[in-house]
Amino acid sequence: MESDVQRPVSLLLNRRGGDYRSDFHNNQTPSNNSKDVEGGGGSFSSGKWPSDYPMKIIWKRGFVRLVLVAGILWMLLILAVLSFHVWSCQSSSVFFSVICNKESKVYNFLNTWGFVPEQHRCPIPVVGNPERIVIPEGRTHDQIVKNISYVMEDEPLKDGSQSSQLFGGHQSWKQREKSFNLSSSMKVHCGFMHNGGADMDLVDIEYVKNCRFVVASGIFDGYDVPHQPSNISDRSKKLFCFLMVVDEISLDFIKANVTVREDHNRGQWVGIWRLILLKHSPYDEPRRNGKVPKILTHRLFPQAQYSIWIDGKMELLVDPLQILERYLWRGKNTFAIAQHKHHRSIYEEADANKRRKRYARPLIDLHMKIYYYEGMESWSPKKSSVSDVPEGAIIIREHTAMSNLFSCLWFNEVNLFTPRDQLSFGYVVYRLGGAFRFFMFPNCEYNSLFVLHPHTREHSSKVEWVKSLSEFKGNGSSMKESRGGLGLWTPYPGDLNSVALPKVVRASKAG
């Protein structure tokens, strides 16, 4: 009897649709079995199945399966979107590479969990023990430029009045042209004009007087907090000054987010970094302010003989003595900078800057037209340098007269035109006609020198979205920088209307 009851139950649980009912009635025997079941109560008490029972089972199972399938499809969709995001950042396609935002929270999350392919890195051939590195005696003497001095005040205007005080001064086109004519003794614009801003506290001025070896960095407009370097030897800790240049906004931000200690001389510290406050920011644009300590390191710290600049979002991984030995002393260089990972031509770099909205598109075009008019060709293997475009996040220098002159001329271009310093580097090299010798090392070594941390927030300004010069008229005039980039608004002594920029053919990934 039990087997008779179990048989229709098993059939019911393993079949669908009308088969349930037909099999059930075909196998059910109208005998006392129903009474026996009836006495037991439960779902069998009626002697037959409820008419809607099979459909309930079907709907329940179907709903569960639907939820599972929908969940799987949703997970696959999310995975596909994330994979596409990572792939777009690695793509050499113009369209897809523009979509990528390496500073987004999604990208940083994927990078943190190891889903983003590691940057191209290679071992750096450094001396194993910093304690054994021999530091050269004396200074490197230049053969061409032996003495350099700086313009500190602008010439009076034609009516005898003084022009407004600007950090970079009011360099004329004639003065700019003259600055590229090399002689043994030169006087050039190099920032820090009288009453132009970027003032240091007296306590910091006194401190840096004792700094011969410098690791410098900078944070402006509160975009980062200091990252402590790793693998620093005891010798380097004693030898180097680690100087973090900040503006007032960043100092307040740092104090609110990390521990800042004050020594007995009122010096402010975050770990190994001595904070150097620059009061009275010289520019409206925070990115342009950051070029002051980056390019004019020799002006901020005039007693320094050697300096290593690293961007504020970077964590240094290699001992600074090993860096100086590898990139300067071993090859008898006085200036070293990394090759850009993707671009060799400044026109390709300018194209990438426009696509990624790093500055106003028409102003980048104007900047490049001036350079092309003045003879700056696209990079080719015929050039003596391996690239016209550097990775400017790390700069290694001995502060010789020629190295200092190059830094001044480079800064003057950044001051006159767009704040994108990578666009001006190769131009200054070109104008010096081979007199400035430098070491441009492989990008894979550059990526092995540091860990790159994301900014605390993304940078954005209205000027970056400008597509036409007409947008600067009327209410848009407020987007014009009032203290930098004035060369973009000063009539140029040449016909730029006839200039057609070289066509950019993208053969590499976007940087």
Role assignments for model-derived ranges:
Residues 2-511:
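Glycosyltransferase catalytic domains, chiefly GT-A lineage
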